[in-house]
């Protein structure tokens, strides 16, 4: 077995990189990652919380990889142990949070859109997820809202109002998925996890949403990483085989 190269880590996005979007990881990918860990240190970084990442990558995710960063690294595990947490509540404080949430709920209440359901704001430890239609809608309703939003720009308009109103809080607004957008302090994107990787001088990051506006963009562009854009889990395996295992995995 080849020895691990010191100072080198391969860091992976989850959705669209290690798994198909919102799907569970395949046994083949788990086996490949196990092989990869023999030659390089391996970490995963996802925007979702640990519960959702565990649903996709398995319950032993914090020990299957050397590093596991959930919520972009706001919750950080190394070798299965929790090494750091940061929360929106402690960062902003309850008064500012309440001001933002109250304004947002009033805005949604006055919004004239075809349907509304429930759970308009989901409070996560590192971000707020805001959905004008409400996260309790069905898949069919999601699809309909996405089409409606493309025409009427509901989310885009809402974000520009909130950005102006709460400019003093230095928040980042990231529109993603079909029905919602995320709100978090500036710098709390995936580059946040890099503070835990000071010992590595070569950080290879693999992600699918590396374009401007995508949630892999900042870490892909960071001067601390070597960025790789992938198109699917199969492409991830192919690129890693060539990069780290010295073989072409295209003909399997």
UniProtKB/Swiss-Prot annotation:
User: EC number(s) per UniProt?
Assistant: 5.4.2.8
Catalytic reaction equation(s): alpha-D-mannose 1-phosphate = D-mannose 6-phosphate
Q: Which keywords are on file for this protein? A: Cytoplasm, Isomerase, Magnesium, Metal-binding
| InterPro entries linked | HAD-like_sf, HAD-SF_hydro_IIB, HAD_sf, PMM, PMM_cap
Q: Which residues bind alpha-D-mannose 1-phosphate?
A: 22, 124, 135, 142, 180, 182
Question: Which Gene Ontology cellular-component terms appear in the entry?
Answer: cytosol
Quote the record's binding site residues for Mg(2+) 1: 13, 15, 208
Q: Which domain of life is it from?
A: Eukaryota
* Classification via Pfam families: PMM
| Tissue expression notes | Expressed in roots, stems, leaves, flowers and immature fruits.
The GO biological-process annotations, alphabetized, read as: GDP-mannose biosynthetic process; mannose metabolic process; protein N-linked glycosylation
Pathway connected to this protein: Nucleotide-sugar biosynthesis; GDP-alpha-D-mannose biosynthesis; alpha-D-mannose 1-phosphate from D-fructose 6-phosphate: step 2/2
User: Where along the chain is Mg(2+) 2 bound?
Assistant: 220, 225
Q: Which cofactor does it need?
A: Mg(2+)
Please tell me whether the keyword Magnesium is annotated for this protein: yes
Give the annotated active site. Answer: 13 (nucleophile), 15 (proton donor/acceptor)
Principal location class = cytoplasm
Q: Where in the cell is it found?
A: Cytoplasm
Any GO molecular function: metal ion binding
Q: Which family does it belong to?
A: Belongs to the eukaryotic PMM family.
- Share what the entry says about its subunit structure, partners included: Homodimer.
Give the misc comment. Overexpression of PMM increases total leaf ascorbate content. Silencing of PMM decreases significantly total leaf ascorbate content.
What is its biological role? Catalyzes the interconversion of mannose-6-phosphate to mannose-1-phosphate, the precursor for the synthesis of GDP-mannose. GDP-mannose is an essential sugar nucleotide for the synthesis of D-mannose-containing cell wall polysaccharides (galactomannans and glucomannans), glycolipids, glycoproteins and the antioxidant L-ascorbate. Can complement the yeast temperature-sensitive mutant sec53-6.
The protein in question is named Phosphomannomutase
Organism, as annotated: Nicotiana benthamiana
